[in-house]
């Protein structure tokens, strides 16, 4: 079986590990570092979150660890369950289970997380971005308002960015667009604040376009260990397929730039699920 790894926040239970019986001696920050070091050897981690035990339980901590890959989470669970790892007493590790059937819309990773995931699978020089267009739309709207003689007490900075992510090893290019609008008042905030907000809005537009481009890609991890990429501009695909169905993906180039002017939905930020959605398994 081949595993598909999307550029999305991992919310599946089989990508989430619950770790408990953590000692009360170290601080939460120290435990976070130790857990990250111990579990990152099995695969790239999306997040490590450490929480104190409930007041009715004995002193100590538990943790919620999210992997991008379900295979990596399974390997980590088998290797670390009932092992001492970094403390004198063994910890218990289980795959996550939910209180109830909760369905979440897949959330897009932010641009930095997308680049981190791409670097992990394709190498630090395995992908790059090419900005096709970066345009400020604020002046256009301002001229339209001047022509109509409609006074505006406040203005907004608006930037549009179109770019493409390039994966040379897979002969793949994926387009993305981003639009950012930042309300402001040039008179109240002053010229320095205006310049800073303008620079920030420009940067956010690039980041949103970069994230949008990555959302159209799926990382394909074959059983042989080879890595491929699949380009799907308008479909949400999460799961595992048989390797025969994915045969040839490594040599199949992605589609060129399409639908450049198509309006995209708003950018989804990088969120984490609340820990209350999971429960600790029954102790053996």
Curated annotation (Swiss-Prot):
Induction: Heat-shock stress up-regulated mRNA expression of isoform 10 and isoform 11. Heat-shock stress down-regulated short N-terminal mRNA expression of isoform 2, isoform 4, isoform 6 and isoform 9.
Domain comment as written in the entry: C-terminal half (amino acids 134-284) contains cytoplasmic retention domains as well as determinants involved in its stress-induced nucleolar accumulation.
Keywords, in A-Z order: Cytoplasm, DNA-binding, Nucleus, RNA-binding
GO molecular function: DNA binding; RNA binding
Necessary for nuclear and nucleolar localization, as annotated region: 90-133
Name the record gives this protein: RAD52 motif-containing protein 1
Region described as Necessary for nuclear localization and for nucleolar accumulation in response to heat shock: spans on this chain: 1-92
């Amino acid at each position: 079986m081949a595993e598909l790894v999307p550029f999305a926040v991992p919310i599946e239970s089989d990508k989430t590990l619950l770790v408990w019986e953590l000692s009360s001696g170290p601080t939460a920050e120290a435990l976070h570092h130790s857990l990250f070091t111990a579990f990152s050897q099995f695969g790239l981690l999306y997040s490590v979150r450490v929480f104190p035990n409930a007041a009715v339980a004995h002193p100590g901590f538990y943790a919620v660890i999210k992997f991008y890959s379900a295979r990596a989470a399974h390997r980590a669970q088998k290797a670390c369950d009932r092992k001492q790892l970094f403390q004198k007493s063994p910890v218990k590790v289980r795959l996550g289970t939910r209180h109830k059937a909760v369905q979440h819309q897949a959330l897009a990773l932010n641009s930095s997380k997308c680049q981190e995931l791409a670097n992990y699978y394709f190498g630090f020089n395995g992908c790059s971005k090419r900005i096709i267009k970066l345009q400020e739309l604020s002046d256009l709207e301002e001229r339209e308002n001047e022509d109509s003689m409609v006074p505006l007490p406040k203005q907004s900075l608006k930037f549009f960015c179109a770019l493409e992510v390039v994966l040379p090893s897979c002969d793949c290019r994926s387009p993305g667009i981003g639009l950012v609008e930042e309300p402001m008042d040039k008179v109240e905030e002053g010229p320095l604040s205006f310049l800073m907000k303008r620079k920030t809005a420009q940067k956010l537009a690039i980041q949103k376009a970069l994230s949008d481009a990555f959302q159209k890609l799926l990382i394909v991890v074959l059983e042989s260990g080879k890595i491929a990429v699949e380009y799907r501009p308008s479909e949400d695909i999460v799961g595992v397929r048989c390797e025969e169905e994915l045969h040839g993906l490594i040599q199949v180039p992605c589609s060129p730039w399409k639908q450049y002017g198509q309006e995209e939905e708003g950018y989804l930020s990088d969120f984490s699920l609340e820990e209350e959605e999971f429960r600790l398994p029954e102790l053996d």
